[in-house]
Amino acid sequence: LSSHYEKLDGIERCIDDEIPFEIPDNWIWCRLNMIGITQTGNTPSKTHSEYMGDEIPFITPGDIQDGHITYNNQALSTQGKTVARVCSDGSILQVCIGGSIGKSAITDREICFNQQINVISPIIVCSEYIYAIMQSPYFITSMKEQAGGTATPIINRGLWGSLLIPVSPLSEQYRIVEKQRELFDKITLI
């Protein structure tokens, strides 16, 4: 077996003790924050009524259910958008605090989101593939371990972004996503 290394700030270090399982030779282990832009949401001050409106959906953990997002519960004005965190369609939202930790969904539009949600906007990888990894027992368990055993588990963006994920070649990502769709379609017929 070959060893696994990462190079950060010009320093190479062995990460064998972090590798949870073997992956095919043409796959790589990668930190979540290396495959896209990560951010944590925020809530514009409600004392500024001009921030509220109907221009852009404002998402909270309660709006994420079973991999879907309810977009019409709250919204911000154009001015509110300027003080909020914004992500584009194809970004993956994941609740990172409390009993809902790990709930996630892919947005199909530009949105703003609150501080209980971390987002990754994938670059050069398939969003649906990364979403599938983030829903896996491996990833959810890793999140909860990093969140600690407090009464209210929480994982900050730095720890969340440092979680390792297995990344396959892009063509394989699309094949995996398509196969997963086929299987889920068959399951819904049962």
Please provide the spans of the model-predicted regions:
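Extended, domain-scale alpha-helical bundle/helix-rich regions
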Residues: L1-I11
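Sequence-specific dsDNA recognition surfaces
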Residues: E12-E18, N33-H48, G62-D89
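Non-catalytic DNA-recognition/assembly elements of restriction-modification systems
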Residues: R13-N42, P166-E178, E182-I190
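Glutamine-centric residue-chemistry signal
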Residues: Q39, Q94, Q115-Q116, I140, ...
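Short, ligand-facing micro-motifs at secondary-structure edges
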Residues: T43-T47, I64-A75, D89-F113, E128-A132, ...
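A short glycine-rich beta-alpha junction/loop motif
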Residues: I111-N118, E128, G149-V167
